[in-house]
Amino acid sequence: MEAALLLAKLPEAYQIFDPLVDVLPIIPVFFLLLAFVWQAAVGFR
């Protein structure tokens, strides 16, 4: 029963991380753009 109460309180505890979770899926796109910019900087060797 205590585990159920703990799980019920978890969403409230993680509410501050909601903006972070919204940004997380975009991070791989940033890596892709970074790789493209890096290749452009070295002249597409």
Curated annotation (Swiss-Prot):
Family: Belongs to the PsbK family.
Subunit structure: PSII is composed of 1 copy each of membrane proteins PsbA, PsbB, PsbC, PsbD, PsbE, PsbF, PsbH, PsbI, PsbJ, PsbK, PsbL, PsbM, PsbT, PsbX, PsbY, PsbZ, Psb30/Ycf12, peripheral proteins PsbO, CyanoQ (PsbQ), PsbU, PsbV and a large number of cofactors. It forms dimeric complexes.
Function summary: One of the components of the core complex of photosystem II (PSII). PSII is a light-driven water:plastoquinone oxidoreductase that uses light energy to abstract electrons from H(2)O, generating O(2) and a proton gradient subsequently used for ATP formation. It consists of a core antenna complex that captures photons, and an electron transfer chain that converts photonic excitation into a charge separation.
Any single biological process term in GO: photosynthesis
Designated gene of the protein: psbK
Bilayer-crossing regions: 24-44
Protein's name in the database: Photosystem II reaction center protein K
Subcellular location, record wording: Cellular thylakoid membrane
Membrane-topology descriptor: Single-pass membrane protein
Keywords: Membrane, Photosynthesis, Photosystem II, Reaction center, Thylakoid, Transmembrane, Transmembrane helix
Matches recorded under HAMAP family: PSII_PsbK
A single GO cellular-component term on record: plasma membrane-derived thylakoid membrane
Pro-piece positions: 1-8
